[in-house]
Amino acid sequence: MAFLKKSLFLVLFLGVVSLSFCEEEEREEHEEEKREAEAAESAENLISKRVPPGFTPFRVD
């Protein structure tokens, strides 16, 4: 009986450890995606700041 208890605790412990590693990897991936999105957004903002508002290069009067 003691052997089964130890085995069960070992399995549960290893399951919890592997679950925490998976959650950590998911969190890192999410943070990386967030950083990439912010970088893309800042690049778009830089492009839009270069052109004055209301400027259209192909304006026909």
Swiss-Prot record:
Localization terms from the record: Secreted
Source superkingdom: Eukaryota
Region described as Disordered: spans on this chain: 27-61
Keywords on record: Amphibian defense peptide, Bradykinin receptor impairing toxin, Cleavage on pair of basic residues, G-protein coupled receptor impairing toxin, Secreted, Signal, Toxin
A Gene Ontology molecular function term of the record: toxin activity
Propeptide: 23-48
Gene Ontology biological process terms from the UniProt entry: defense response
Pfam families: FSAP_sig_propep
Tissue spec. comment: Expressed by the skin glands. Expression levels in inguinal glands and granular glands are virtually the same.
InterPro entries for this protein: Frog_antimicrobial_propeptide
Stretch forming the signal peptide: 1-22
Residue pairs linked by disulfide bridges in the UniProt entry: none
Keyword rRNA-binding carried by entry: no
Primary location recorded for the protein, binned into one broad class: secreted
GO cellular-component term (any): extracellular region
Function: Induces contraction of rat ileum smooth muscle (EC(50)=2.73 uM) but has no activity towards rat smooth muscle from tail artery, urinary bladder or uterus. Binds to both bradykinin receptor B1 (BDKRB1) and B2 (BDKRB2); the effect via BDKRB1 is stronger.
Family: Belongs to the frog skin active peptide (FSAP) family. Bradykinin-related peptide subfamily.
Name of the protein this chain belongs to: [Val1,Thr6]-bradykinyl-Val,Asp
Originating species: Physalaemus nattereri (Cuyaba dwarf frog)
Lineage of source species: Eukaryota, Metazoa, Chordata, Craniata, Vertebrata
Protein's gene: BKL
